[in-house]
Amino acid sequence: SLGEASSFMINTNVSDSRQVTETTDDFESYGLTLALDTSLGNQSLSPYLMLSKTDYQDDADSFSLMGGIGGYFPVGDRNSFSYGYSYSDSWNNSNSTDTSAWETDSIGHGITLGHDFAFNEIISSSLGLGYSISEARVGTNDFETYDFNVRLNLAFPWAYISIGDALSFNDYMHVDTSITADRIRSDYVNAFDLMLTKALGDLIPFLDRSKSLYINLSYEKVVSEANIINYDYDAESVSISFSRSFHLNK
């Protein structure tokens, strides 16, 4: 039977983007997420469904549907294994200003496997493998992706630090003659990230006496290299966010 501690989540979001110049790139997006967290035996299961729509100022509107399930189970006191499957369907309604949008309509499948290990109460690690395939209406957009990632987590009493590195290898299946006539695109992306989370109350006690408001700092560096130079790029980003937890029944 399903676990008694099951929970169900409904999440909606709306975002709006307006640019000072080049307003043709303005858009609004809408999203709905339904998710269930439950258990079956020693398995923790999390099926989900996500729907989204993006309305562009001039370009074709885009839609997407994604569903899947993730799960994990412990082995002993230090090990746990995770797995997941996802299905996605995305499409565009071509209009007079974007008559080829339908070419990127695609259906995708993905699987993931992961292993978490706790060295002690402070140090833990995560390893992950993934495979996905995306098949579009026009074959030049078909590709397979192979993922590998590793993460080290440090749960210090004064802060939580997470360091991760991920590799993604993308292999396209057909030649894109609009770019080159004799080479099938193949590339890889290396993403390194560093995240730090700390309670605001540790820094400014009178603003957060309960230490339930957290500051999240993150840094990410992405390097992409391909056998077609058009797709080579480097990118760096820094972000800060705040999060707070609370109980509805207290």
Task: Identify the residue ranges that each predicted region occupies.
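Gram-negative and organellar
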Residues: 1-250
